[in-house]
């Protein structure tokens, strides 16, 4: 449920080193337009939007830093359009290889708002971030919470998705809720998790492309993130992507799901080091 505010620590450091940094907000998020219909928010639409954005700005030689939905969208685009990219950093990232037959996720039917939901934590979706490993049943709880809650508790979600060592600043947490003045504008954060249920083979071409991606590829994970920050997912990328060979992959004990908020300055330093090392 985040927006480009998440990247402020990284952008500050990288711009100071002379880089051009672009952090687009997905439609329905941040400062972008917010279609109020949940039917607008499907995986293909968001991928098409970002690819159009890249082409409109005529971006080339991109060094991609992607995390969470930034990776489900970004890695698909990079896998299908490798000519636009010079390198990739995948941090707490994933691109699922679901087919119509293998995707276990679903949107609850009939779809109704559950007025009994009073908080993210009480809805038990927090288990998604604190269980002992990736579990599709737990992720389904997250999907159901977002699509049926009468209010997406974004600042609470952020607080539970940051490092145990992170000094929680309520003003910072509230900044993630700020783009959504009322429930009607929350169609984006409500539907992003359930968009996974609509992935039925669209990523397979991109995965094939990533298997042939020989340009530099770096994997960084926050070990407190039990969903995407797992060595299993990191090793999958290292084995799958040819360009991952010889790179300085790292695991950070002090970081959780939103690694850009927890250790954004370190992420910027690693990105700079990656670019310099590989002469991108």
Segment roles from a protein language model:
Residues 26, 93, 254:
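Active-site loop/turn elements of alpha/beta-hydrolase fold enzymes
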Residues 244-280:
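Catalytic active-site module of serine/aspartate enzymes centered on a nucleophile-bearing elbow/loop
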Residues 2, 225, 256-259:
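Glycosyltransferase donor-binding loop in the core domain
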Residues 10, 77, 270-274:
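Hydrophobic residues on the short alpha-helix immediately C-terminal to a glycine-rich phosphate/catalytic loop
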Residues 6, 29-65, 69-248:
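Flexible "cap/lid" subdomain of the alpha/beta-hydrolase fold that forms the substrate-access gate
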């Amino acid at each position: 449920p985040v927006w480009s505010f998440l990247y402020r620590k990284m952008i500050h450091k990288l711009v100071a080193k002379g880089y051009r940094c672009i952090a687009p907000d997905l439609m329905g998020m941040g400062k972008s337009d917010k279609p109020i219909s949940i039917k607008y928010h499907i995986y293909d639409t968001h991928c098409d939007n970002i690819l159009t954005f890249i082409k409109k700005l005529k971006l080339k030689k991109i060094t991609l830093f992607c995390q969470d939905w930034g990776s489900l969208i970004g890695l698909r685009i990079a896998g299908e359009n490798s000519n636009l990219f010079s390198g990739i950093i995948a941090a707490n990232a994933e691109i699922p290889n679901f087919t119509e037959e293998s995707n276990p996720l679903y949107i609850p039917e009939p779809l109704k708002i559950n007025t009994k939901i009073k908080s993210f934590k009480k809805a038990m979706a927090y288990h998604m971030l604190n269980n002992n490993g990736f579990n599709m049943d737990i992720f389904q709880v997250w999907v159901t919470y977002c699509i049926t809650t009468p209010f997406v508790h974004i600042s609470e979600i952020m607080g539970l998705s940051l490092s145990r060592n992170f000094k929680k600043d309520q003003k910072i947490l509230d900044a993630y809720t700020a783009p959504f003045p009322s429930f009607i504008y929350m169609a984006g954060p409500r539907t992003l998790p359930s968009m996974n249920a609509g992935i039925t083979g669209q990523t397979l071409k991109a995965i094939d492309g990533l298997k042939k991606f020989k340009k530099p590829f770096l994997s960084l994970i926050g070990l407190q993130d039990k969903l995407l920050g797992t060595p299993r997912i990191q090793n999958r990328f290292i084995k799958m992507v040819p360009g991952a060979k010889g790179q300085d992959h790292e695991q950070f004990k002090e970081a959780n799901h939103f690694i850009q908020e927890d250790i954004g300055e370190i992420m910027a330093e690693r990105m700079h080091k990656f670019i310099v090392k590989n002469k991108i």
